């Protein structure tokens, strides 16, 4: 099965509200902003044809500068008022010949080339794919402040990014 062309949409448009105002996509990891490390992971993956980074308007210039040497970065653009809107805008900015889309969080820089490649190849075969890990915490279903049930942890997976689909 030939590998379809895959474009990555890196979502980096958050408000940093959960980080006490610290912008996690620009926070340094080993001296390099997380969003630059994230973009580099996709830049260095042969399964990725192009990258669109969706961010806040005030971060377009600094992120563009960080990605200046990355030839797969097609656009660094403003996102929307929600994650869903930002993803939609990013998807619409991909080239018309892109057949698969990988959605990834800009503040998740430690994604490996192997994970990206496996997700693209799985989506190429099955239509969609996302990495997942078994849930370690006990999860409760709560309604009206009361615990209704406890799902069997063995049946639960925590889904991560990149989420790839055709």
Language model features by range: what are they?
Residues 68-100:
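Short phosphate-binding loop-to-helix
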Residues 46-75:
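Acidic donor-binding segment of Leloir-type glycosyltransferases
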Residues 110-165:
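Conserved core of the sugar-phosphate nucleotidyltransferase
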């Amino acid at each position: 099965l030939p590998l379809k062309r895959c474009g990555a949409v890196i979502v980096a448009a958050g408000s940093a509200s959960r980080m006490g105002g610290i912008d996690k996509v620009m926070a340094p990891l080993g001296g390099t902003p997380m969003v630059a490390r994230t973009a580099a992971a996709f830049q260095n993956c042969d399964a990725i044809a192009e990258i669109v980074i969706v961010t806040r308007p005030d971060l377009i210039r600094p992120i563009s500068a960080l990605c200046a040497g990355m030839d797969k970065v097609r656009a660094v653009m403003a996102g929307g008022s929600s994650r869903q809107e930002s993803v939609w805008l990013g998807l619409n900015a991909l080239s018309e010949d892109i057949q698969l889309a990988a959605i990834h969080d800009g503040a998740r820089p430690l994604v490996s080339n192997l994970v990206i490649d496996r997700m693209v190849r799985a989506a190429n075969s099955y239509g969609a794919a996302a990495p997942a890990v078994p849930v370690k915490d006990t999860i409760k279903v709560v309604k009206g402040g009361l615990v209704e049930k406890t799902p069997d942890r063995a049946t639960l997976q925590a889904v991560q990014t990149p989420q790839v689909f055709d």
